[in-house]
Each structure stands twice: as C-alpha cells, then as structure tokens.
C-alpha cells in the first residue's frame, strides 16, 4: 500500500541520514548532536521546498471511520482523531514491550544509558543506533501521515511546529520515558486548546512553552523522567 511505501522510504532516509550526519558525531557532545539535528531538519525542509514548491497540496484521508458527536454536539471527534489516539496508544504499548522485553530493545536502553559500558558488554553500538534511527524514522512517517490526514493538506513546512511540539512533549513527559512522551503530548495538547479557547488564539503556542519552562524549573527530568545517578 501507499502507506507502507511512505514508511519504507522514510525508514531508509533516516538510516542514510544517520550514517552521513550522525555517525561521525559518535564521540561529540550532546549539544553538537542537537545542533546537527536542527540543521538536518532545516536542510530537508528547504530541499522539499525546492523540489515541491511552497504551495500546499491536498492530502486525502485514509480513514473511513465516521465522526462521533458527544455532549449534544459540543465535542466532535473526527475519524482521524480517533485513529490517531488509538495508534498512539498501540505504538506506546508496542515500544514499551520492545524496549523492556526484547534483546535489541534492552540493547537500546543500555546504549542510551552508557555507550562505553554497553560496548564493553559486547553490544554492537553502531548497529543499535542505526536500528534506533530506523524505528524513529518509521514512526515519524506514521505521525506525518496521521497529521496530514487530519488537516487534509501537505506542504514542506507542515511538520515544523508539530516537530518542535513533539520534542517539547518528550522533554515535558521525561526524556527516555515512552509513557511520559505520550502523557506530555496529551497534557500539552490540552493546555494549548484551553489556552486558545479561554486566553488567546495567538498565545496558545506560547502557553505550551511557558508551561514547559515551569515544569523544567520545578522538575528538570520531566514528569516521568528519572534523575541520572552519577557513578564515582
């Protein structure tokens, strides 16, 4: 199907980017990797602008589920929204099981916590990181399809703000915690909607980042994040 093709293309693209842009930075600082990630995202966005142009294109929805009306029409859940929520829950459960109960998942956790120790234990660090990028790219493709299906439009800059908010949700919920990322995204979405409804349409996004700053000041590890223990 078309979705499988999109997913495969994004997976391969993610692995190529990892090999070209991130593998040379294995021993670099986290800040260097973050700056590289921002640079790569802008590079891909501008390449898409050159190839496809800035004009929005229609994106047909693949969801055939009818909308559901609740509370006498005060709340309407579209089919795309229902599928997105269900997909997020399923992906969270699968990823949690994968990282907790499979050999490769445990290897990913080991590499993320202590790369040098993981390598000494016989874990293939490069292969593990490449697999992580492949899984992340595949999930990004699924998220992109769900996003474009919801708004029925597609353009090179469509994923800019959602990408920033996704990173914000991960930090909000706790880096390294899969349920935390889902919880962070849910809470940020509620804050944004309530802010736009009761405060100001223009300040909706600003409120999201303001709440993030407050949470990080109070609990730097995020809502479900665990503090790192320094070994002496």
Task: Give, region by region, the residue ranges found by the protein language model.
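Hydrophobic/aromatic residues within transmembrane alpha-helices
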Residues: 21-22, 43, 117-118, 171, ...
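Transmembrane helix-bundle core of multi-pass membrane transporters
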Residues: 24-101, 128, 194, 199, ...
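Short, small-residue-biased leader/transition segments that mark boundaries at the very start
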Residues: 3-5
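Membrane-helix interface segments
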Residues: 1, 27-31, 178
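Hydrophobic alpha-helical segments embedded in the membrane of multi-pass proteins
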Residues: 141-142, 155-175, 186, 190, ...
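Helix-loop-helix "hairpin" substructures at the membrane interface of multi-pass membrane proteins
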Residues: 74-154, 178-184
